[in-house]
Design a protein with these regions (language model features):
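A contiguous active-site-proximal alpha/beta segment in oxidoreductase catalytic domains
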Residues: 68-118, 128
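N-terminal Rossmann-like dinucleotide-binding module
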Residues: 1-32
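Short, well-ordered coil/turn elements that cap or connect secondary structure elements
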Residues: 1, 20-23, 55, 82-84, ...
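Contiguous beta-strand/loop segments that form the cofactor/metal-binding neighborhood of enzyme cores
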Residues: 123-132
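Nucleotide-activated donor-dependent transferases that construct or modify glycoconjugates
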Residues: 6, 44, 110
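Beta-loop-alpha module in the N-terminal Rossmann-like domain of NAD(P)-dependent dehydrogenases
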Residues: 16, 26, 30-79
């Protein structure tokens, strides 16, 4: 049984809550007892909140974006390594039909994007560090 604490119950927080629901594998709990903290809060709060929970030696699952810059995202992943905990970032759009993704073990390459106005470099910056 994994003990989880959800912070933020807006649009995506509600989706996460409903998706996990009454899972027999997950126990909703107070933050001090949690194995995992799930952050579904406004983007500009992510860096500070993730830093705080990593410092408490909690595993963190953060809705995208992890931070507002590449540098701060890298700092968070390095800090998670230092603290010996896990840090994951959700990007639900990665799995949509809009993208054909090729996994070359070391990097992802988008081919034939249907939506031309997306900044793909920024999308890579915050959630593909685990490949390094």
């Amino acid at each position: 049984m994994v003990k989880v604490h959800l912070i933020g119950h807006g649009k995506w927080g509600a989706v996460i809550d409903n998706a996990i629901g009454d899972s027999r594998y997950v126990e909703w709990t107070d933050s001090k007892d949690a194995d995992w903290i799930i952050l579904s809060t406004p983007n500009d709060l992510h860096y500070e909140q993730v830093s705080y929970w990593l410092a408490q030696k909690k595993n963190v699952f953060c809705e995208k974006p992890l931070s507002l810059t590449y540098k701060s995202a890298k700092e968070l992943f390095d800090f998670a390594d230092t603290m010996g905990v896990r840090l994951y970032v959700d990007d639900v759009f990665t799995w949509r039909d809009d993208y054909d993704i090729y996994d070359d073990v070391n990097h992802f390459v988008w081919t034939k994007p249907k939506q031309k106005d997306i900044n793909y470099i920024d999308r890579l910056a915050y959630h593909h560090f685990y490949m390094w």
